[in-house]
Amino acid sequence: RASLPASIRRTPLLRLAREASEVGKEKLQLKAECLQITGAYKPRAAFAVINALSQESLSKGLVLTSSGNFAQAFAYAGSYGRIPIVVVMLDTTNPYKVDMARNFGAEVVFCGTDALSRQATVERIASDRGMTAIDTWEAQPIVAGHGSLGLEILEDEKEIQTVLVPVSSGGGAAGVAAAIKQSRPSVRVIGVQPERANAAYVSLKQGEPTAIDYWETIADGLSAVRPGEYPFRHLKKYLDEIVLVTESEILEAVRTIIFRAKVIADPAGATATAAFLAGKVETSRRTVAI
């Protein structure tokens, strides 16, 4: 955390009452990373990666593939340090996400419509331009950078009993879980995934990273078809469990966050809250949802 720049916000914990009778005695708080610079927690990891690289590597730039939050995170971190950033995206990427990456200073390179072509394009650009390729699924500093989230929660809520964290490829959840369990083992850390994008859930059941055949969820930020090898080891070691939520439960969480907390979270950002609101976890415990 000490290496993160001042522009990375220490986001607040927002109390969320499910109904009027809970006001003043809320069990649920939201770690509002939707208020983070770029609108998500990924810049924490992007800066951790950059801080781990040599000045020579940074001067030549970084190349990665991302369809959303990591693209914006590295674009922002790169502009902060005047580091060239190239992001490889599919032709079908949401135009808003393309524009946001460009607005933060990244060069966007399209690679067609085949998802398997993304990594090959990254490797070609890295070779042609002498850039450093970043694997956002396996880079160890990414897990460490996300750990800052867990530490902030422990510092800001001394009586916390449960932390709910959304899971996709696993880097964010792995970092949060490792930081919390190493600091305060009694706190339960529970991962949350959409029922229709449950690769990490399946992988924990199988005991190894396992790919799912497809995903279909409104929470497209949690659409990894397989967890990364490195983060999976942390998930297996530190997560207490993963629970699943339905599409309707995710949408209801988005609605509740808007009306009760007065902030806007996208479906991926509302997924952890959905587990609490739908009773997928013990709701009598003091809980933080990321």
Show which residues each predicted segment covers.
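PLP-dependent amino-acid enzyme catalytic core
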Residues: 1-290
